[in-house]
Amino acid sequence: MLKQLKRLSLSLLLPVLAALTLTFAMPSMANDSVAAKSAEKEMTQLGGADFWRQVRAGEEGYTTSQSPEHGVLISTAGETWYVLKEKWMSPLGALAIFGSLAMVTLAYFTIGPLKLSKPKTGRRIQRWSKMDRALHWSMAFTFLTLAFSGLCLVYGKHFLKPILPTDIWGMIIYAAKQYHNYMGPIFGILLMTVLVKWWRKSIVNMTDIQWFLKMGGMVGKHKGSHPSAGFSNGGEKAIFWLLIWFGAIAAISGFVLDFPIFGQLRRDMELSNLIHMFSALILICGFIFHIYIGLFGMEAGLEGMVTGDVDETWAKEHHDLWYAEVKDLPENQPKDKNS
């Protein structure tokens, strides 16, 4: 009987305690809610429509920070940058890249590679030194990896992010950003080295104009004609100066983005970003054609940059003026098989 009374008293006590708790808690919760609403109302009244209109207009307010533009809550120019980058440059850049890939693919299957008109003789002509080849492949590796990491930063969110786990996507994009930031200055150094090393071989002359008029002997009525050329033909010189000019623009704008410690404002960074992206896209499209010619578009086109020398027939047909200059040099004489 005593146990039953204890259970009954406990069952009655618990609801009473709960009611008392709610009685004291509800006013407190209500007060908190009222205080929050009061604070929100006060903030709205303090800000007002005029305040937020000024914020949206990009007007600068007061702040204790002495850094430039720290008093600006909303950068109106940032919206313009976003639209130009995401709505125009990104899709047009993708179209240009895929268009370039489509063009070289079409060229391969319709025009085909440029073949040698005569058999190889086996006589080797020295063309590129070890230093030249090391510089070329260093630049090639740096450029291609920067292009890949840059494309990941611009287009990865459209193609990779939807199919990858969040953690893996985060690691990839972080690695791409860090690699791009640290490798960019190295690209600039290599670019200056390339300019100093090869600019004399890349001065355009009338022979190159004729080369362009005949479209390098690769298409049309001049296909297979092998127009005259010195050490570098018109196409190689065009690629060289494309690399130098747009590479310099990409390197300088990248430096501005890499080191925002020289008083750059938001608009400086936004403009540098657009210029950097535009110049990089031009370089990528240009080097799609360069890579195509080296790998697929010309017979033995890659030999010289791999081994350092080329076959005599290739030298005669593609760089006849240069061949005439170097054919009698001691290093280009046929090797005595018995020696």
Pin down the residues of each PLM region.
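Hydrophobic secretory-pathway targeting helix
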Residues: 1-30
